[in-house]
UniProtKB/Swiss-Prot annotation:
It is an enzyme of class 2 (transferase). The active site is at 95 (acyl-thioester intermediate), 347 (proton acceptor), 377 (proton acceptor). It catalyses: an acyl-CoA + acetyl-CoA = a 3-oxoacyl-CoA + CoA. Gene3D superfamilies: 3.40.47.10. This is 3-ketoacyl-CoA thiolase. Heterotetramer of two alpha chains (FadB) and two beta chains (FadA). Catalyzes the final step of fatty acid oxidation in which acetyl-CoA is released and the CoA ester of a fatty acid two carbons shorter is formed. NCBIfam families: AcCoA-C-Actrans (TIGR01930), fadA (TIGR02445), PRK08947.1 (NF006510). The lineage of its organism: Bacteria, Pseudomonadati, Pseudomonadota, Gammaproteobacteria, Oceanospirillales. Its main location: cytoplasm.
Length: 392
């Protein structure tokens, strides 16, 4: 196909394995080290990439405190072969942070503000718990319900509004785990995972290159025994149908097509369009619907044109209404989260946007599809989406 010189392309995309956030494999590895590992991997895997030519490192991270504070993008970049002359910034759009990093790089290249960016994100939810240091303004309750900050309750509400029952959620959760486990067993994640040294359950140093959050024996019977965790009396959302707390990092090398040509690189995909949208905070999980609609409109596409989809599975009760209203529910078996999703792999907040883009590009290559969509919801009522066209 014919590309324009200023088209934005992805030349490589990688991630760490997703580790548990409680006594996990990365319990002795800091967030900066995980970030540095995936940044450096892009150069190790692509000899033609020149670290000194990076225009900026843009890194997503949500809870920017403790080891994730003070511009973790820069703190991680200086631990790689990227020279000190290359700047770095950390961005925060909660769950959508690292996808927003991609969008910023895309916009900058379109505007002529550079040609080559390293983007991605990280979250170490074991070292830096999700609620550590959070201090919400009490006055905000005059404008949004306090429960809107409780993601599980927003999923309960969205599920009830769309008539999503417990059995449907349980089946969705089991599917995620079973598909992720099959992908692990068959090596489908091998091309995207960068091995990082960590520790196994016995404390021995190991190269961690397999996702450890997946429930290998997930089944409907056991899933049905789990109790609701957010609304114990009348709820339907359980730990088995919620994204797991986890630890991980992911990174993409993004540049203009003319720069890729000059470097003799074959891009994986072109960034076709992007979208970001808001929705009511009480149903924050619905955000992917308007965000995807924006991205599709910008590209002049319809949802039926999209062949492969990665939807971040914050909750089954949230994902199912999104898929229904996007017209994807009946296409799940051949198009959506074919290697499972965040329910099985976990949702390390600042990492997830880049992670689902990375997995999407990997699945598109394996399935030999052309157009793909990565989209996710964002706490307090937002959604973000990116449409890709596979090039090789």
């Amino acid at each position: 196909m014919s590309l324009n010189p200023r088209d934005i392309v992805v030349v490589d995309a990688v991630r760490t394995a997703m580790a548990k956030a409680k006594h996990g494999a990365f319990r002795n590895v800091r967030a900066e080290n995980l970030s540095a590992a995936v940044m450096q991997a892009l150069f190790d895997r692509n000899a033609n990439l020149v670290p000194a030519e990076v225009d900026d490192v843009i890194w997503g991270c949500v809870n920017q405190t403790l080891e994730q504070s003070m511009n973790i993008a820069r703190n991680a970049a200086i631990m790689t072969g990227i020279p000190r002359t290359v700047p770095a910034q950390t961005v925060n759009r909660l769950c959508g942070s690292s996808m927003s990093a991609l969008h910023i790089a895309t916009a900058n290249i379109k505007a002529g503000m550079g040609d080559f960016y390293i983007i991605g994100g990280v979250e170490h939810m074991e070292h830096v718990p999700m609620t550590h240091g959070v201090d919400v303004n009490p006055a905000a309750s005059k404008y949004a319900a306090k429960a809107a900050m409780m993601m599980g309750l927003t999923a309960e509400l969205l599920g009830k509004m769309h008539g999503v029952g417990r059995e449907e959620q349980d089946a969705f959760g089991v599917r995620s785990h079973q598909r992720a486990q099959a992908a692990n067993e068959n090596g489908y994640f091998d091309n995207e995972i960068v091995g990082v040294e960590g520790h196994d359950a016995d404390g021995f140093l190991r190269l961690i290159d397999r996702d450890e959050v997946i429930r290998q024996d997930a089944n409907l019977e056991d899933m049905g025994k789990l109790k609701p965790v957010f609304d114990p009396k009348g709820g339907t959302v359980t730990a088995g149908t919620s994204s797991a707390l986890s630890v991980g990092a992911s990174a993409l090398a993004v540049m203009s097509y003319e720069r890729a040509q000059a470097l003799g690189l074959e891009p994986l995909a072109r960034v076709v369009s992007t979208g970001v949208a808001g929705c009511d905070a009480s149903i924050m999980g619905y955000g992917p619907v308007p965000a995807t609609q924006k991205a599709l409109k910008s590209a002049g596409l319809a949802i039926d044109d999209i062949q492969t989809v990665e939807l971040n599975e914050a909750f089954a009760a949230q994902s199912i209404p999104v898929l229904k209203d996007l017209g994807l529910r009946e296409r799940m078996d051949d198009a959506v989260n074919l290697h499972g999703g965040a329910i099985a792999l976990g949702h390390p907040l600042g990492c997830s946007g880049a992670r689902i883009c990375t997995t999407l590009l990997n699945v598109m290559r394996q399935q030999d599809t052309t157009l793909g969509l990565a989209t996710m919801c964002i706490g307090m009522g937002q959604g973000v989406a990116t449409v890709f066209e596979r090039l090789k």
